[in-house]
């Protein structure tokens, strides 16, 4: 079978569809272009959407660690008054509260999420402890002690209509936005989980440069017109 793409090295910017895993998109791309050397600059949870930076070919995948360390920007929605075990909409509900925070209380609590903060990775995450991913322990009902990590964040409240709290956030590598929503809910005394998440920027690559990830499902789709170099220029 003739492959749809002739140019097989470069950076492909994808707007990840909701409900798809990041690795399912990588597998689809591998099948589409016949190149096994494909990396990324950060995954997204299945419920999340937005910028995924795909690195195609050895020349580009070797710099994945550099791109992984770049800052990211998100638009997010927290659901107040309810908590889940995974801190997001895919988890099991473990608590509810009738408290309705005021906008002033929310603004005051949000000031904590400015600059350098300490964060503990959620149990439902791919962070490894003793050689196992945390979600492997969580699925067995186990809670493992996790080390705090230091991250840089800048959070801005953009809209509030209870129970939904919209915010934007710029953050450093390794920041769990689910944990931000969870911690904010705890500070407000009502609990919260992350309802929606959209990555708007990864390093210098933005959402308006991305193609719809669903296009990768088309067997004759040619990605070559959309491949970029490290500076974001078209190849």
Curated annotation (Swiss-Prot):
InterPro entries: PsdUridine_synth_cat_dom_sf (IPR020103), PsdUridine_synth_N (IPR002501), tRNA_psdUridine_synth_TruB (IPR014780), TruB_C (IPR032819). Pfam families: TruB_C_2, TruB_N. PANTHER family: PSEUDOURIDYLATE SYNTHASE TRUB1, TRNA-PSEUDOURIDINE SYNTHASE. Belongs to the pseudouridine synthase TruB family. Type 1 subfamily. Its EC number is 5.4.99.25. Keywords: Isomerase, tRNA processing. This is tRNA pseudouridine synthase B. Responsible for synthesis of pseudouridine from uracil-55 in the psi GC loop of transfer RNAs. It catalyses: uridine(55) in tRNA = pseudouridine(55) in tRNA. The keyword tRNA processing applies. The active site is at residue 45. The lineage of its organism: Bacteria, Pseudomonadati, Chlamydiota, Chlamydiia, Chlamydiales. GO terms for molecular function: RNA binding; tRNA pseudouridine(55) synthase activity. GO terms for biological process: mRNA pseudouridine synthesis; tRNA pseudouridine synthesis. The keyword Zinc does not apply.
């Amino acid at each position: 079978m003739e492959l749809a793409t002739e140019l097989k090295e470069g950076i492909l910017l994808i707007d990840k569809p909701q409900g798809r895993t990041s690795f399912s998109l990588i597998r689809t791309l591998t099948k589409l272009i016949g190149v096994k050397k494909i990396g990324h600059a950060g995954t997204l949870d299945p419920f999340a959407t937005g910028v995924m930076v795909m690195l195609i070919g050895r020349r580009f995948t070797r710099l994945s660690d550099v791109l992984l360390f770049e800052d990211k920007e998100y638009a997010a929605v927290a659901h107040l008054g309810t908590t889940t075990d995974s801190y997001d909409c895919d988890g099991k509900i473990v608590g509810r509260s009738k408290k309705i925070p005021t906008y002033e209380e929310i603004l005051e609590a949000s000031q904590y999420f400015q600059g350098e903060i300490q964060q503990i990775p959620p149990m439902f995450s791919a962070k490894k402890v003793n050689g196992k991913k945390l979600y492997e322990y969580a699925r067995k009902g186990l809670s493992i002690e996790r080390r705090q990590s230091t991250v840089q964040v800048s959070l801005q409240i953009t809209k509030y209509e209870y129970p939904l709290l919209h915010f934007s956030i710029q953050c450093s590598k390794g920041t769990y936005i689910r944990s931000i929503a969870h911690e904010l809910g705890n500070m407000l005394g009502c609990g919260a989980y992350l309802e929606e998440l959209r990555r708007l920027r990864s390093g210098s690559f933005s959402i308006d440069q991305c193609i719809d990830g669903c296009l990768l499902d088309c067997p004759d789709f040619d990605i070559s017109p959309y491949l970029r170099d490290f500076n974001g220029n078209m190849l």
